[in-house]
Amino acid sequence: MEPIPASRSTILLETADPASEAARACLQAYYDELARRFESGFDVALSRDPDAADMRPPRGSFVLARRDGLPVGCVGLKGHGGELAEVKRLWVAPAARGQGLARRLMQCVEQTALQLGIRVLRLDTNSSLPEAIGLYRSTGWVEIPRFNDDPYPDVFFEKTLHDAL
């Protein structure tokens, strides 16, 4: 994937290995924020796919957002082989919030999913993240019943993708 420049911004999106140093830095910042915001804390070892191994080609993808070369956001696409996948680990650094970056990351992961033949995306989140829930609802995600046994999420969404994203 070629870097995608942001309009009126220096933030670029690029695919990355989730095990790369920049990706690990974003993921650790994400985990630290969840630990602060969740009443019960957060331990990535208790979540599904703690090492993000399924967020790699050919079934998945991991996207980093960089400003001046530094990571400021990320999102993962966890493919299951077939037309269904999960969006995981959406995070934007506090200094980069309020600029539409989370929306851009979600658009990028949806486009990638379509390129991989994925037609239905699911995601889970926690009610302690109302800004994420608002983003999902405003971009066409529909709340669905629980679809996994991960201990942290309590809100679940699904979106059917169409070729004209």
Predicted stretch roles:
Residues 1-5:
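Actinobacteria-biased recognition of intrinsically disordered, low-complexity terminal regions
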Residues 7-8, 26, 119-122, 126-139, ...:
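C-terminal "cap" of GNAT-fold acetyltransferases
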Residues 9-88, 93-94, 106-108, 112, ...:
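Acetyl-CoA-dependent GNAT
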Residues 21, 99, 130:
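Loop/helix-junction capping segments adjacent to catalytic residues or to phosphate/diphosphate-binding pockets
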Residues 83, 99, 115-119:
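Short coil/turn segments at alpha/beta junctions that flank glycine-rich nucleotide-binding fingerprints
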Residues 93-95, 99, 127:
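Active-site acidic-Proline motif in GNAT/NAT acetyltransferases
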Residues 99, 103, 107:
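Residues forming the Rossmann-fold NAD(P)(H) cofactor-binding site
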Residues 106, 112-125:
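Conserved GNAT acetyl-CoA-binding A-motif
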